[in-house]
């Protein structure tokens, strides 16, 4: 299967067959985040049953082979910061602004309305 052919959760699962169980869980949880919403590394870790693995979630997303299909730009730090290097953070900020996510003072303005 080619990356361009991926449309459904089942397609994502098939494409990620060579990833670890943890990486698949992280990427599938991230795949579910809708446009205009964000989650945090901590929330993803909790969602997949590994509540203390937020750094490992970040590492798995850093190796995301399906960006932007699996929208890792929608996962931010618990303080609304973008994380990563300055260039990557700026690109993520622009993508999120384009999707209608509120940004204030260089961070996502986290609220129950946009948290997934």
Where are these regions (language model features)?
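Nucleic acid-binding interface residues in structured DNA/RNA-binding domains
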Residues: 2-116
């Amino acid at each position: 299967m080619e990356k361009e052919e991926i449309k459904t959760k089942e397609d994502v699962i098939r494409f990620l067959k060579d990833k670890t169980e943890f990486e698949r869980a992280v990427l599938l949880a991230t795949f579910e985040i809708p446009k205009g919403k964000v989650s945090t590394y901590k929330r993803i870790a909790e969602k997949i049953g590994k509540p203390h693995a937020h750094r490992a979630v970040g590492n798995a997303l850093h190796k995301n082979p399906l960006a932007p299909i699996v929208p890792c730009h929608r996962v931010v730090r618990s303080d609304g910061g973008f994380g990563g290097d300055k260039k990557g953070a700026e690109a993520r900020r622009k993508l999120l602004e384009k999707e209608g996510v509120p940004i204030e003072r260089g961070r996502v303005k986290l609220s129950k309305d946009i948290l997934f």
